[in-house]
């Protein structure tokens, strides 16, 4: 992201969700984004993932500027190269957990058999192997969240965007999620993870703090959450 700003409304009602944000995420690295509610974290993710246009600035993925892409090209990019984990999960109710995870791979041309094998492996790594045949309404909130995460990391993604990926999970399952995201990064995926959890952020290579739509601090975390908490307090 280069000098990205996003405003909503006009004149007296104008709201600056993001202001002149610069953010670079290298392949194989994870960046955690922290900040209070309303600081612009979710807006940053939607713009980074080509789901929303910035008011000013540009977004590049793999060196290609999104502003120069056609609508169809952006759609292909989202389907093939970007994995999303948002707080509402967006699972298809008529598909099982395994089918939800495998669907993006099938849409990208992978055979149904290979897509299912990859999907089952991702679910198994998150402790959901025995729930693969269940529909979303048969799963708990935490289980649905893990299905959404499995769907986001499966396949040949280049960019993973996650909004509070451990928000509905206990500490054990939260760590399983971070291990899966970390494994994706080791395969060369670039990850941006929005979180309020310092323990989760300690997995990142770099932490960015947002406040009122502006980047206020950047740090490389030391092992463990204490360095993040003290870093935020000492800004």
Would you name each region that the model predicts?
Residues 214-235:
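Conserved beta-strand-loop-alpha-helix hinge in the C-terminal portion
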Residues 2-206, 210:
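ABC family nucleotide-binding domain
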